Design a protein with these regions (language model features):
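Short, aromatic- and glycine-rich surface loops/edge beta-strands on solvent-exposed regions
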Residues: 1-4
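Edge beta-strands of jelly-roll/beta-sandwich modules across compartments, strongly enriched
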Residues: 8-20
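GH16 jelly-roll
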Residues: 23-177
Length: 177
C-alpha cells in the first residue's frame, strides 16, 4: 500500500511464488516448483483470478487516502504492475491509491517468494510488501502472523526493513530481520 501526502510515483511489483515438498528443514534449492506467478503480460486491469482490490477509506495505518480499483490508481503496463498514488479529492479524502491483495485467491504455507519492485522515496509514502496470515479476519492481527518483506516508511527516513509480527511481538522489535 502507499500512504501519500504529496502525490506519488509509479511502483512496479513483480511476484513469483514457488513451493515444494517440505521436510523439517527444507534446503533452499528445494523450492523450485513454481506454483503461482503474475508476470503482468496483459496491459490494463489486474488479473482478477489472482488479485483483489480492497477499496474504501484507509483503515490500517492512519493513511490519508481512499483506496480504489480504478485504472488511475493501479494498472498493468509494459510488463509492470503500477500502483499510483494521486493527489485528488475522492470520497472525502485528498488522495487516492490502490491496495491489492491475493489472500482470497491463493494460500501458501511454505515456499520462496521472489519480488522485483521499484519503490518511491517521496515524502508521505509508505511502500510495503507483506505476507499476512489468511485467517486474519477470524483470529485477528497479530495472532495470524505477518511477515513484512519490505517496508520503507518515510517517517523512518526511508529505511527499508523486514519485520516478523506475532502475538508476543506485534511491534516487530527484536524480530527485525
Amino acid at each position: 500500500y502507499l500512504r501519500t501526502k504529496d502525490g506519488g510515483d509509479d511502483v512496479a511489483w513483480y511476484v513469483w511464488l514457488t513451493s515444494g515438498t517440505v521436510s523439517e528443514t527444507p534446503p533452499l534449492d528445494q523450492f523450485t516448483n513454481l506454483v503461482w506467478s503474475d508476470e503482468y503480460n496483459e496491459n490494463g486491469a489486474l488479473d482478477s483470478n489472482k488479485w483483489v482490490h480492497e477499496v474504501g477509506d484507509s483503515w490500517f495505518n492512519n493513511e490519508v487516502q481512499s483506496y480504489t480499483s480504478r485504472l488511475d490508481n493501479s494498472k498493468v503496463e509494459d510488463g509492470k504492475l503500477k500502483i499510483i498514488a494521486k493527489k485528488e479529492s475522492y470520497n472525502g479524502n485528498n488522495y487516492t491509491s490502490a491496495r491489492i491483495i491475493s489472500n482470497t485467491k491463493k494460500d501458501f504455507t511454505y515456499g520462496r517468494v521472489d519480488i522485483k519492485a521499484k519503490i518511491p522515496g517521496k515524502k508521505g509514502t509508505w511502500p510495503a510488501l507483506w505476507l499476512l496470515g489468511s485467517n486474519f479476519k477470524t483470529i485477528t492481527w497479530p495472532a495470524c502472523g505477518e511477515i513484512d518483506i519490505l517496508e520503507a516508511a518515510q517517517s523512518n527516513n526511508f529505511r527499508v526493513q523486514s519485520t516478523v509480527h506475532h502475538p508476543d511481538n506485534y511491534g516487530g522489535g527484536d524480530t527485525n530481520i
